[in-house]
């Protein structure tokens, strides 16, 4: 058992208030810590009978979160507790700090009123996202499932934190082959859609670009309902890729002959974004993964030059 797992029944320590979500590996509850009255998020992970001890996915998540907990833009894992379900099965509770809302709900609140998110708010959220991802990537961690729903935020302070690192995996060079049970389609990088088995931090940067565009327009930029449809949405905006635009693309496993589209201008998809913003977005949404801007370089981009409180974010 991981040394940090405390064998105290979680239900003695916490009062469940409501179910707030269903993660990849288990349910998430808003709960109150009885001793302090503090509100926390409890992520409940079931341990299957056929597994010896704690699932490797959970142990991986715990070790990653412990390592990343130092960063202000990664949701903090406060504790890990063991408990028993009604059926007497062992369950593990990951205790996280609780955040009131997430970027998906935040965008929806603007969309429902027909208003745009203020430019400086978008800048601040994007800077924090790039900063958090630069920290993860700097520690050899890919998120692989970035989307507005797992970017938690405090609406009072506009502090953003990256959550749900359940699918995160430490990457070391050379890149390992990965399974692709990852990512919600809308934020999925084209190399993943095309069946690449070697990928890098660039998959997260594509997702960051999609989130950026969505903050600007209140709508997801590519809304495919299948892997093929998702690719076609991307091709319609950026043109159907070829070997000249993206060397090696035609060797990817899922590559076929696709309809030929000519590129449109990116600014037409994000009409309210200024020139510097469009430039940064275009660097995030490059076809060729090696050409995509890194999170660290994105933080240095002129788009963020007029953000006053960078050092305090």
UniProtKB/Swiss-Prot annotation:
Class of the enzyme per the UniProt entry, highest EC level: transferase
Species this protein is from: Arabidopsis thaliana
Record-annotated active site: 145 (proton acceptor)
Modified residues (Phosphotyrosine): 25
PROSITE patterns: PROTEIN_KINASE_ATP, PROTEIN_KINASE_DOM, PROTEIN_KINASE_ST
Keywords: Acetylation, ATP-binding, Kinase, Nucleotide-binding, Phosphoprotein, Serine/threonine-protein kinase, Transferase
Gene Ontology molecular-function annotations: ATP binding; cyclin-dependent protein serine/threonine kinase activity; protein serine kinase activity; RNA polymerase II CTD heptapeptide repeat kinase activity
Record-linked InterPro entries: CDK, Kinase-like_dom_sf, Prot_kinase_dom, Protein_kinase_ATP_BS, Ser/Thr_kinase_AS
EC number(s) recorded for this UniProt protein: 2.7.11.22, 2.7.11.23
Residues the record lists as binding ATP: 20-28, 43
Lineage: superkingdom: Eukaryota
Cellular compartments per GO CC: cyclin-dependent protein kinase holoenzyme complex
Gene: CDKB2-1
UniProt modified residues of type Phosphothreonine: 179
Protein name as it appears in the record: Cyclin-dependent kinase B2-1
Pfam family membership, one: Pkinase
Protein kinase domain span: 14-304
Tissues/organs with expression: Expressed in root tips, shoot apical meristem, leaf primordia vascular tissues and tapetum of anthers.
Residues where N-acetylmethionine is found: 1
Gene Ontology biological process terms, A to Z: G2/M transition of mitotic cell cycle; hormone-mediated signaling pathway; regulation of G2/M transition of mitotic cell cycle; regulation of meristem structural organization
Additional note from the record: Protein abundance may be regulated through proteasome-mediated protein degradation.
Description of how the protein assembles with itself and partners: Interacts with CYCD4-1 and CKS1.
């Amino acid at each position: 058992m991981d040394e940090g797992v405390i064998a105290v029944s979680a239900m003695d320590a916490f009062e469940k208030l409501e179910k707030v979500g269903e993660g990849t590996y288990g349910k998430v509850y808003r709960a109150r810590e009885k001793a302090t009255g503090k509100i926390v998020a409890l992520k409940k992970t079931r341990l299957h009978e056929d597994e010896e001890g704690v699932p490797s996915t959970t142990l991986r998540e715990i070790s990653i979160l412990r390592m990343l907990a130092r960063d202000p833009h990664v949701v903090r894992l406060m504790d890990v507790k063991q408990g028993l379900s009604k059926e007497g099965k062992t369950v593990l509770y990951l205790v996280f700090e609780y955040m009131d809302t997430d970027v998906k709900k935040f965008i929806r609140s603007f969309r429902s009123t027909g208003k745009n998110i203020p430019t400086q708010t978008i800048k601040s959220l994007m800077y924090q996202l790039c900063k958090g991802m630069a920290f993860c990537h700097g520690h050899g961690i890919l998120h692989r499932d970035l989307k507005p729903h797992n970017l938690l935020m405090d609406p009072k302070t506009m502090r953003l934190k990256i959550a749900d690192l359940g699918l995160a995996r430490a990457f070391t060079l050379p890149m390992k082959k990965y399974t692709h049970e990852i990512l919600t389609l809308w934020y999925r990088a084209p190399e993943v859609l095309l069946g690449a088995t070697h990928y890098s931090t660039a998959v997260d940067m594509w997702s960051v670009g999609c989130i950026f565009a969505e903050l600007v327009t209140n709508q997801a930029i590519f809304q495919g309902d299948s892997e093929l449809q998702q690719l076609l949405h991307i091709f319609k905006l950026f043109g159907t890729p070829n070997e000249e635009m993206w060397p090696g693309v035609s060797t990817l496993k899922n590559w076929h002959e696709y309809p030929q589209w000519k590129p449109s201008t990116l600014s037409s998809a994000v009409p309210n974004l200024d020139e510097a913003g469009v430039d940064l977005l275009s660097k995030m949404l490059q076809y060729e993964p090696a050409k995509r801007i890194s999170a660290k370089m994105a933080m240095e981009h002129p788009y963020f030059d007029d953000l006053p409180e960078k050092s305090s974010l």
